[in-house]
Amino acid sequence: MARKIGIIGLGNVGAAVAHGLIAQGVADDYVFIDANEAKVKADQIDFQDAMANLEAHGNIVINDWAALADADVVISTLGNIKLQQDNPTGDRFAELKFTSSMVQSVGTNLKESGFHGVLVVISNPVDVITALFQHVTGFPAHKVIGTGTLLDTARMQRAVGEAFDLDPRSVSGYNLGEHGNSQFVAWSTVRVMGQPIVTLADAGDIDLAAIEEEARKGGFTVLNGKGYTSYGVATSAIRIAKAVMADAHAELVVSNRRDDMGMYLSYPAIIGRDGVLAETTLDLTTDEQEKLLQSRDYIQQRFDEIVDTL
């Protein structure tokens, strides 16, 4: 059976997702959905022009909701980056009103298409929007996943790697909670060179607070520099999609609705063909557990506020 992935929204992030998927040969068939007909048609032709120079071939159809019925994965990149660029508060809720209004129509179209695969959400504020997609579509919660702090964790790994002169892939551990200002690095989970980082930090000149701030603010450095973020978050979504397509049973820190939290937030889960296959349990410190609950409460509050306006 052919592997199929849909992408809703072909802006900067959606195009980066499409390029990464197609270049890596993750699927055989792709469905591009975007309100800008000229743009999505141009992307279709542009990628078709690239096929002769790629190792993998991909078939692309555009703006055909019915074609999503048998898609394995759909990735939503809805948003309006201009709202974030003009946002003086430095959080990811500037796009909430705009994106939440789109979720209603897009979620309805997605449900009516007969899609029954795994929905991966990038759109900011991602935890609230992921919860809203699940609310609007009625899809099982385990089949609706947000990229969450998978990107923030990668930023933490980069910062820690730089501090220790290591490849970021040699750093393990997680950022948890909201993909936003209430997120935190769960330092009790972070290990470097086979040791807990807190042990190494106590013994050396390592400023964990500075590393955490770098992870939290990294996205805004990119946003201020080029006007948007794309490659980091696109790669996060692709990693989730690949875990689903391969039924990898991979442990990834994604925005998911845990039974003990009752709301979407980022916490490691086992990801495979059916989305979230199992929950994990981290041995967090008391302080980390309190931060997680505070982050959960904030996401819940913002979700309740937007649901009341629908």
From Swiss-Prot:
CDD domains: HicDH_like. Substrate binds at residues 92, 124, 155. One of its GO terms (molecular function) is L-lactate dehydrogenase activity. It holds the Pfam family Ldh_1_N. Its EC number is 1.1.1.-. NAD(+) binds at residues 34-55, 124. GO terms for biological process: lactate metabolic process. Keywords: NADP, Oxidoreductase. InterPro entries: L-lactate/malate_DH (IPR001557), L-lactate_DH_AS (IPR018177), Lactate/malate_DH_C (IPR022383), Lactate/malate_DH_N (IPR001236), Lactate_DH/Glyco_Ohase_4_C (IPR015955), NAD(P)-bd_dom_sf (IPR036291). It is an enzyme of class 1 (oxidoreductase). The active site is at 179 (proton acceptor). PROSITE patterns: L_LDH (PS00064). Catalyzes the NADP dependent reversible and stereospecific interconversion between 2-ketocarboxylic acids and L-2-hydroxy-carboxylic acids. 2-ketoacids with medium chain length (five to six C-atoms) are the best substrates. PANTHER family: L-2-HYDROXYCARBOXYLATE DEHYDROGENASE (NAD(P)(+)), L-LACTATE DEHYDROGENASE. Belongs to the LDH/MDH superfamily. LDH family. Can be applied in an industrial process for the production of L-amino acid. Homotetramer. This is L-2-hydroxyisocaproate dehydrogenase. It comes from Weissella confusa (Lactobacillus confusus). The lineage of its organism: Bacteria, Bacillati, Bacillota, Bacilli, Lactobacillales.
